[in-house]
Amino acid sequence: NIEPLPIEQKLKESIFINQVMVVGQDKKTLGALIVPDFEKLEDYTRETGIEYASRDGLLEHPTVKNLYRTELKSLISPKNGFRTVEYIPTFRLLSKEFEIGMELTQTLKIRRNVITEVYGEHIASMYR
């Protein structure tokens, strides 16, 4: 069994990740729902010359997806004490932050059951 909390805590060390929830503990591979740090991500797009029409367009941009893929690989690695089964090969970038009273408790803990329900289609798409 894989404990998601240490993985999520490590991923939040990235300047580009604001919120994250690991999914797929019952699947062959893990996945992640990631809420980017949009301020840092927009700084990155200015520096690299990425053009986009909307926030959703930004999140689908191949360069942005590669940035997050690289972040996941470097953070969840054996050099950081993670096992290969804890690597996250698939993820979805979300355009909306998790909110207190909805996806988060008053103490900012993730409500996994709520997020799984709200983002069920995103999660399912990672395993098709």
Question: What is each model feature region?
Answer:
Residues Q19, R69, K73-R128:
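Conserved C-terminal "lid"/linker of ANL adenylate-forming enzymes
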